[in-house]
Each structure stands twice: as C-alpha cells, then as structure tokens.
A protein has these predicted regions:
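Short glycine/proline-enriched turns and hinge-like loops at secondary-structure junctions
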Residues: 8-12, 37-39, 198
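Alpha-helical interface subdomain recognition
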Residues: 43-48, 53, 59-64, 68-220
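Flexible, small-/acidic-enriched active-site or ligand-binding loops
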Residues: 21-52
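Residues embedded in well-ordered secondary-structure elements
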Residues: 5, 33-35, 106
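Residue-level signal for secondary-structure boundary sites
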Residues: 7, 24-26, 52-55, 215
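A short core secondary-structure module
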Residues: 1-27
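Active-site PLP-lysine loop of aminotransferase-like
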Residues: 3, 35-36, 75, 153
Length: 220
C-alpha cells in the first residue's frame, strides 16, 4: 500500500499482512483459464480496507524492495515448474518413440527423431543448470542475483514450452488428445512465459544490467 506522498514513488510503498477475511476484501469469480487449472485464479479487490500499523512488514517504505525480492524467488519457482513439465514431456516422448512403430520399425530408430530428442534433452539440461546457478546467486545475496534470476526464468520457460510443444509433435495426433497428458503440459507451460514478469520484461532487466560496467565481464 502507498503510505508516502503521491509523488514519493517506490519509496512511498509499504508492505502489510492483511487477513483474508478482513472487512472490505472481496473475491471475484474463478477465472476460466486455458491452462494451469489446478491453481485457482480470482481477482482480489480492496475497498477501504483498514489494516493496523502492527501488520506492517519491515519499515515504512520497504514494500517495493520486498516485492522485488519476492519476484526473484518467484521467477526461479516458475522456471522450475517449466523444468518439471519439460522433464515429463521428455520421458513421455522417449517411451512413445520406443513403443510406436512405422514401416515396421520403432520410431526411436529414425535418426531425425533421435536428433529431436537429443536437442530437447540438451536444452533441458542447459536450462536446469542456469536455474541452479540463479538459485545459488540468490542464496548468496549476489549483487547480480536479479539478472541471473531473469536469465533463468526467460530461458527455462521458453525452453520448457518448446520441449513440451516438440513432444506433442512427436506424438502426432495422439499428443493433441486429452486422454494423453501432453496437451495439458503444453497449455500449462505457456503461461510460464507470462507469470512473474513476461519474458520480454526479463530481457529488459537483463539488458539493463549488461549495460552496467563490469557486468558482462562478471559472466565469464
């Protein structure tokens, strides 16, 4: 909530713990989403909600800093969700290629499909390494942790969606049928590129830090 003057910017924002049943809070209808339906989404409205000063987190004016710090962890969380979905998609693809036959041969014996599986696994491994590095930077309080979290979120969520999408392609028409889990993985991972800051915003965060003297050298 803004506790400072209207023109105080980020320095005028403070964080508070608000009881979910506080007077003045209302909740909208459950949103009918394309994916991620295991996590309900509703609009939360605050209308003249009164909160005691004792409910403030930290000092006055620290709210924006808390929010930004939470975003870094949230970005690692979303990136990890993409890793899990991509891992499952890769396993399903391996199994399907070993079971399905065309022209008297298992699909796994076709080199073009082997190459696709190899690329999916390589991208997943690279993304997992980047996410672990970002988590380490955040735990260590590294000055460039936010940039690393943005890199991990951008790469892992783009990769996660692409791996799931490629897995669906490998399954052919079966991948598009709700009886199989791949269509859900594709729908669920699509929103990862939007949550906790869109991937376009991630690129902006990264680029701004890269233009800071010494940042690029620190990546070596």
């Amino acid at each position: 909530a803004r506790t400072g003057e209207p023109d105080s910017g980020a320095a005028g924002i403070s964080a508070f713990v608000v009881p979910a049943d506080a007077e003045g809070i209302s909740y909208g209808k459950k949103e009918d989403k394309m994916g991620w339906n295991s996590q309900p989404t509703r609009l939360v409205s605050f209308d003249r909600v009164r909160v005691a000063a004792a409910n403030r987190l930290g000092e006055e004016g620290e709210g924006f800093r808390f929010a930004m710090k939470a975003l870094d962890g949230g970005r690692i969380n979303i990136a990890t969700c993409s890793l899990g979905a991509a891992q499952k998609a890769l396993e399903l693809s391996r199994d399907y290629l070993g079971e399905r036959k065309q022209f008297g041969r298992e699909l796994a014996q076709f080199q073009a499909l082997q190459f696709k599986l190899a690329d999916m696994a390589t991208e997943l491994t690279a993304a997992r390494t980047l996410v672990r590095l970002a988590a380490f930077k955040l735990d260590e309080g590294d000055a460039e942790a936010s940039a690393h979290c943005a890199m991990a979120k951008r790469f892992a969520t783009d990769m996660g969606f692409e791996v799931c999408n490629q897995a669906l392609q490998l399954h052919g028409g079966y991948g598009y049928i709700r009886e199989y889990p791949l269509e859900r993985l594709v729908r669920d991972t699509r929103v990862h590129q939007i949550l906790e800051g869109t991937n376009e915003i991630m690129r902006l965060i990264i680029a701004r830090r890269l233009l800071t003297p010494g940042m690029i050298e620190s990546l070596a």
